[in-house]
UniProtKB/Swiss-Prot annotation:
GO-annotated molecular function: aminoacyl-tRNA deacylase activity; ATP binding; valine-tRNA ligase activity
Principal place of residence: cytoplasm
UniProt-listed GO biological process terms: valyl-tRNA aminoacylation
Protein name stated in the entry: Valine--tRNA ligase
GO CC terms, sorted: cytosol
Subcellular location: Cytoplasm
Amino acid sequence: MKQEPTTYQPEEIEKKIYEICSHRGYFEINGNEKIQEKGKRFCLMMPPPNVTGILHIGHALTLSLQDILVRYKRMDGYKTLYQPGLDHAGIATQNVVEKQLLSQGVKKEDLGREKFIQKVWEWKEKSGGAILEQMKRLGVSTAFSRTRFTMDKGLQRAVKLAFLKWYEKGLIVQDNYMVNWCTKDGALSDIEVEYEERKGALYYIRYYLENQKDYLVVATTRPETLFGDSAIMVNPNDERYKHLVGQQVILPLINRTIPIIADAHVEMGFGTGCVKVTPGHDFNDYEVGKRHHLETIKIFDEKGILNAHCGEFENLERLEARDKVVAALKENALLEKIEEHVHQVGHCYRCHNVVEPYVSKQWFVKPEIAQSSIEKIQQGLARFYPSNWINNYNAWMRELRPWCISRQLFWGHQIPVFTCENNHQFVSLDTPLSCPTCKSEKLEQDKDVLDTWFSSGLWAFSTLGWGQEKSDLFNESDLKDFYPNTTLITGFDILFFWVARMLFCSESLLGELPFKDIYLHALVRDEKGEKMSKSKGNVIDPLEMIEKYGADSLRFTLANLCATGRDIKLSTTHLENNKNFANKLFNAASYLKLKQESFKDKERLNEYQTALGRYAKSRLNLVTKEVRNALDNYRFNDATTLLYRFLWGEFCDWFIEFSKVENEAIDELGSVLKEALKLLHPFMPFISESLYHKLSNTELENAHSIMVMPYPKEIAQDEKLEHEFEVIKDCIVSLRRLKIMLETPPIVLKEASVGLREKIENTERLQNYAQKLAKLEKVSVITYKPLKSVSDVGEFCQTYADLENLDLSPLIARLKKQLEKLEKEKLKLNLHNENFVKNAPKSVLEKARESLKTLLEKEGKIQQELDLLEQP
């Protein structure tokens, strides 16, 4: 016979429970079919992690919160869809496969597009999506049979359809425009650029007038871009330069002339008051160039290599060219000075390459696409949790610029735009055979792919079958049943990358916002509040934490620390504490199991007959009401705190203790714990499942899972009985304090009395519990104060010990010894020494006086006790 473990061993049960529940289809839409209630629908989309990704602590937080909510709704009778999937992650995935090929001496350009994409698919099938398996370790109950991939056949069609619809409405256009350009990864949208503060330099360059005697000094952080200058600009009201407007200056190093122009854009008090205008390589200058009809000159190619506009510097890499340009300026006496300068430098979010403003012909989504979604958010048709995030959303949407959606990659959704030999351009959902305008069969598809966020922006409805032919991955009724989705849970860091785009993509195509509630959680940091990084050595690996503490402890900890709007400071101490919590529950169930073989499910308060059973169930019902309210309002931390306080602070610390007096209540306490485990299940699915079956004397292999049982709903309370037990608890605690105060060997307190501030119905019950749990032979309930007694004051009572028949001399001797010790400690402070007081540093004196204050307080309390004990 297998020996029962003495402590909770998560590794022995987690995999087994997960596999059984998954195999039975509990995670699927109809997994809870027997308890589904008509008209109740719940849908939550998993933010699709990158196919290259592995589970990190941020994923663990998002997935834990999502799964808690999904399990709650599933148990509460909702037809539930928790939609899983993976993102093709264009740049990231291409980089992974590219590196693998380079290690074999193969470049992607040598393979060509089709063969390279074939290699990516091979990699995806072999190594991609490891994160989905890792999610299972966390207990994530998502509908894995419906897993979608943003490059699967159906979603490719949905992407093309969205592009076609927006193209036909004029919301997608192709144009030459200033974009963020990574010389490695190509065009980036504004929010794919990360800005870092860098120490750089400000170069003051001389631009000579045509007379070659006078010059203007212009400051720049990017001297290599001077070859693209189209003008020098001054403020029209600047008296220093008014007379020069309209004249020409000579461009340093290459002797091309450019005009001096006037524009109110220039701040007269900044720098020299003169600025260079480089329309081809600066966002502001690009707009200035359009206003003044200046030439836009590109000085480097897509790889950042300087071109013929740069004279002798042609073929140098842009950043490498900087030092050589500066050296040439010095050599030709064209450099006035160099100053240290701290400024923000944009980097590619993926490869951290320095990003350049660059004019390029790209595809864009116009900002007008978002207008309707913005208006609906203002009308309150979707709510943000915490509510302050709507301010961030509004601020960003007000400044929305055209979204650059074309990317210079092989891997991704190839833009479905075709051009024939006669330059007719059209969009097609399928591969066309001929041009619809001129019937030419010589067609070429646009080589660029769409921004990864284009396809993930459709996630809320494309996964439900929108724009696709029939598939086993969705049902025909899914859009009707699950769109709009109910809730979105994700990190605030992708509010603009993903959430805002889903809002306007969904509203634009389906006429409704994609979800009703948007919960944005904070970031997980280390215990000091610092960002986790490998270089700091403070990264907490969720898989390692699951190995060490169990999935339940990690889930419960993350939910408990997820206070609304605050960053999460995670430490292994938190995980250890919640592993101990799991073990406490294990011990409570084991204790009950020793007393009785199995326990029934009792959902209603009126089924409980013993006073302790009714009290415990009444308290559970209050917690049920509060936990439901917390979950309905996304207060995950409040829900975990309520459960922890009830299960440890009440059930384990009090109800179990009370049962040692009222043994007949054991049966009903087992039923209360079973109901409480259902309440706990969404947070700690494994231990709740295991202990439920332990108390039922069943095995999951042959019984229904707790996860498809109804979530507790009963909220009826017996408030009178609850109050009576609160009074009893208060009396016991007070009596225990009294014993600690008085009991010094050989003194043993055998009798005490209790004075109540208000009457309770059953004083006999109070006396019975108090005698047993405070370990006294007799407890009397009185309405007067004994003449010679010491007392302790509680919230609902005052307890007394009669001193008449006690030999108090050992206690008096102990207290006097404590007074002597305190007197010596006071002398050590030296505050009686005038020289010390006169010469000691202020901080030392303050510390000594604070210590004296503490000692005097202790002395006063002890003296008060002595006076009481020595009274005649």
